[in-house]
């Protein structure tokens, strides 16, 4: 079986080293070219989009390398290494990663975690708090409007639809906390809903919004 690890699927040396170490352990091939090379199993690092929405990303070859690999490796196993979701910090040198078969997102990837033991989760040291039954407001948590997890959805439309849906079921105050990457892009939209007790929050940290929230709503 030929297993190719595509080093140029990421520009970050630390992540390339993960691919190199992985390849060494399983007897794989480290591919240094910008494009796809025929194999039985392909291994890449990071998510992909056919056309990055951020202009500066259009200049980065690794985005096009991954699209080329995905399109030419159809109907064969693709292993995708991506950033972690739990306990994630702002760094490129993560201690843990998610590894998906054929994709990187829940619902599309097979993470081979059905009936898996809890040892890896326990190593993260996360504590699950009891289900909250009290709280003052409903917190809507924003997402980076260019994030791959949105799969091209108009996030402004999702916010408007979500607010309208919530208002049919609750009269609690609604607080919208946006993703910091968006700056103030959503503020004008949220301000148009001020009449129905919807507010935009950008002060302090998200912890203050979570503290007294009755529940949270998020797209991903």
Regions found by a protein language model. Give the residues of each.
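Catalytic donor nucleotide-activated moiety binding site of glycosyltransferases and closely related
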Residues: 5-10, 163-203
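Active-site donor-nucleotide binding/catalytic segment of nucleotide-sugar enzymes
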Residues: 129-184
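Well-ordered, non-membrane alpha-helical segments in soluble/globular domains
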Residues: 15-21, 56-68, 154-165
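A donor-sugar binding/catalytic signature common to diverse glycosyltransferases
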Residues: 44, 203-220
């Amino acid at each position: 079986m030929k297993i190719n690890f595509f080093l140029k699927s990421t520009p970050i040396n630390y992540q390339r080293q993960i691919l190199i170490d992985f390849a060494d352990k399983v007897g794989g091939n480290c591919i240094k070219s910008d494009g796809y090379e025929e194999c039985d199993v392909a291994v890449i690092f990071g998510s992909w989009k056919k056309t990055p929405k951020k202009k500066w990303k259009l200049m980065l070859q690794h985005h096009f390398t991954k699209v080329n690999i995905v399109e030419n490796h159809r109907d064969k196993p693709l292993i995708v290494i991506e950033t972690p979701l739990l306990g994630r910090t702002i760094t490129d040198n993560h201690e843990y990663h998610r590894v998906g078969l054929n994709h990187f997102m829940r619902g599309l990837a097979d993470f081979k975690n059905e009936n898996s033991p809890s040892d890896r989760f326990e190593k993260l040291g996360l504590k699950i708090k009891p289900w909250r039954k009290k709280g003052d407001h409903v917190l809507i948590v924003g997402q980076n409007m260019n994030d791959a997890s949105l799969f091209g959805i108009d996030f402004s439309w999702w916010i408007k639809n979500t607010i309208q849906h919530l208002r049919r079921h609750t009269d609690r105050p609604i607080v919208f906390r946006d993703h910091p990457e968006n700056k103030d892009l959503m503020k004008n939209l949220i301000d148009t809903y001020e009449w129905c007790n919807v507010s935009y929050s950008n002060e302090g940290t998200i912890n203050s919004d979570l503290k007294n929230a009755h529940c949270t709503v998020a797209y991903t």
